[in-house]
Swiss-Prot record:
One of its GO terms (biological process) is translational termination. SUPFAM superfamilies: Ribosome recycling factor, RRF (SSF55194). InterPro entries: Ribosome_recyc_fac (IPR002661), Ribosome_recyc_fac_dom (IPR023584), RRF_sf (IPR036191). Responsible for the release of ribosomes from messenger RNA at the termination of protein biosynthesis. May increase the efficiency of translation by recycling ribosomes from one round of translation to another. Keywords: Cytoplasm, Protein biosynthesis. The keyword Protein biosynthesis applies. It comes from the Bacteria. It comes from Onion yellows phytoplasma (strain OY-M). Disulfide bonds: none annotated. One of its GO terms (cellular component) is cytoplasm. This is Ribosome-recycling factor.
Length: 184
C-alpha cells in the first residue's frame, strides 16, 4: 500500500511539472520586443508537399536583439516562408533580400506591455489552478488507499509541500517574464 502512495506522489509530481512546462511554452509565445527564435517553433512550411517545421528548413539567428534572420537551406523556399509568416498570427511583416527573411520585432508600447503582463498573470493563474486540481486529485487518491492515519497525514503533507514548491516556481517564472516585459 505504501508503494501505491509513493507511485501516486510520483505521478502528481510529473503532472505538476508538465503543467509548468506548458505555461513556460506559452510564455515563449508572448513577444517582449526582443527576438526569440522559439516564437517560430510552431510554424510549418509546405516543403515538397509535406508540412515541415521551419526550424528544420532554415538557420534561424538573432541579430541586433530585436531581429530574427531566417536563412533557408534551400533558397527556393523564401517565397513560401514569407507567405507562411504573413499568414501566421505573429503580427510582423517579413522582409526579404533574396537570401534571408528578416523579422523585425518592434518595441511594445506601454499599453501593450500592460496587456501582455495581464496575459502572463492569467496564464500563471490557470497553471496554479491546474496544479491545485492535481493536488486535490492526489489527496483523494491517497485517502482511498488503506494507510495508517500517520502515513496518510505524511503523504497529504508531502502533496501539499510539492504543491507549494510548484506554486512558488510559477510565481518566480511569472515575475521573471513580467520583468522581461517591463525592460522591453
Amino acid at each position: 500500500m505504501q508503494q501505491l502512495a509513493k507511485d501516486i506522489l510520483a505521478s502528481l509530481e510529473t503532472k505538476m511539472t508538465q503543467a509548468q512546462e506548458v505555461m513556460l511554452k506559452n510564455f515563449c509565445d508572448i513577444r517582449t520586443g526582443t527576438a526569440n527564435p522559439n516564437i517560430l517553433d510552431k510554424i510549418t512550411v509546405n516543403y515538397y508537399g509535406a508540412p515541415t517545421f521551419l526550424k528544420t528548413l532554415a538557420s534561424i539567428s538573432v541579430s541586433e536583439g530585436n531581429q530574427l534572420n531566417i536563412k533557408p537551406y534551400d533558397s527556393t523556399l523564401i517565397p513560401n516562408i514569407k507567405k507562411v509568416l504573413l499568414a501566421s498570427n505573429l503580427g510582423i511583416t517579413p522582409q526579404t533580400d533574396g537570401l534571408v527573411v528578416r523579422l523585425v520585432f518592434p518595441k511594445p508600447t506601454e499599453e501593450r506591455r500592460k496587456a501582455l503582463m495581464k496575459e502572463v498573470e492569467q496564464l500563471a493563474e490557470k497553471t496554479k489552478v491546474a496544479i491545485r486540481n492535481v493536488r486535490r486529485e492526489g489527496n483523494d487518491k491517497i485517502k482511498k488507499v488503506e494507510l495508517t492515519k500517520d502515513l496518510e497525514t505524511f503523504y497529504l503533507n508531502q502533496i501539499q509541500t510539492l504543491t507549494d514548491k510548484n506554486i512558488k516556481l510559477i510565481e518566480k517564472h511569472t515575475t521573471t517574464k513580467n520583468t522581461e516585459l517591463l525592460k522591453a
